Amino acid sequence: MAHVAEWKKKEVEELTKLLQDYPVIALVDVADVPAYPLSKMRESLRDKAVLRVSRNTLIELALKKAAQELNDSNLEKLIEHIQGGTGILVTKINPFKLYKFLEESKKPAPAKAGAPAPRDVVVPAGPTPLSPGPLVGEMQALGIPARIEKGKVSIQKDTVVLKAGEIITPQLANILNQLGIEPLEVGLKLLAAYEHGIVYTPEVLAIDEEQYISMLQQAYMHAFNLSVNVAYPTKQTIEAIIQKAFLGAKNVAVEAGYITKESAGDILGKAFRIALLIAQELPEELLDEKTKELLNQQAQVIAAQPQPAEEAEEKVEEEEEEEKEEEEALAGLGALFG
């Protein structure tokens, strides 16, 4: 049996305890993170999480040991996400917030040949500080529309030179670095996170917050409206249900002419409007001065309202059509009765 170094045993024990002490366990890739940025990230995580970098084999042993001692086989599922230079990040922050924090903590970095682009890389249109030279031909060879303007290299239009996931070539890395475009990111890349028996991958954690907030708001409004319409009282809907019932009862009272403290004003207003409509049909000599004044005011209000030209034309056309139909009907009657 091969001898196992004591430091390895101690490391596995410490990692196992760390895994048991926190509800959220994440694996992060630290392979491409330089020492100084990594130390700055440790500082930023100090009050939020604990980062421990170790050998992949020791992390795997610690996960198996912790899963066995916690009687949680799901914890072992993290092992399949170990890759590259892996670190353990333990925290009390839920996986979604942790993922967002790590993504926002990433900093731009210069192009590096052989590295995959984390997202589409765009060379923007406009002048550059670069002087004419062989670089112009290199740009054009890569599909970048470059030419000389006022003694400097100028890009004619925004150009996507690399799609997300594609590998940066040495030629493109040289051009991007001279243009000052930093397509890469330096930061902790979350490989997977575990909480309460569930392993979350980055694809699951990368949610569109605005979209989900909008979906929740819509769901809330639909549930609210359903509760109000079926008169199902809750803390959130009881006020709206009472208001709806009150307005419904009031409308019934107004339509039926049943006078109450709440409906009297609307009933009188309705009666007043009906009275004015009747007054419009009566001969003017039968009206008193007050009624004439009210009718005159009403006519002025109606006249002051703008009438769209299209609606007016349609109305004229409708009237002409009606007159034509009446004339045709009369002609038909005349022919029928000789």
Swiss-Prot record:
HAMAP family: Ribosomal_uL10_arch (MF_00280). The keyword Cell inner membrane does not apply. It comes from Thermococcus sibiricus (strain DSM 12597 / MM 739). Residues 302-338 are annotated as: Disordered. One of its GO terms (cellular component) is cytosolic large ribosomal subunit. This is Large ribosomal subunit protein uL10. It comes from the Archaea. The gene is rpl10. InterPro entries: Ribosomal_protein_uL10, Ribosomal_uL10, Ribosomal_uL10-like_insert, Ribosomal_uL10-like_insert_sf, Ribosomal_uL10-like_sf, Ribosomal_uL10_arc. The lineage of its organism: Archaea, Methanobacteriati, Methanobacteriota, Thermococci, Thermococcales. Disulfide bonds: none annotated.
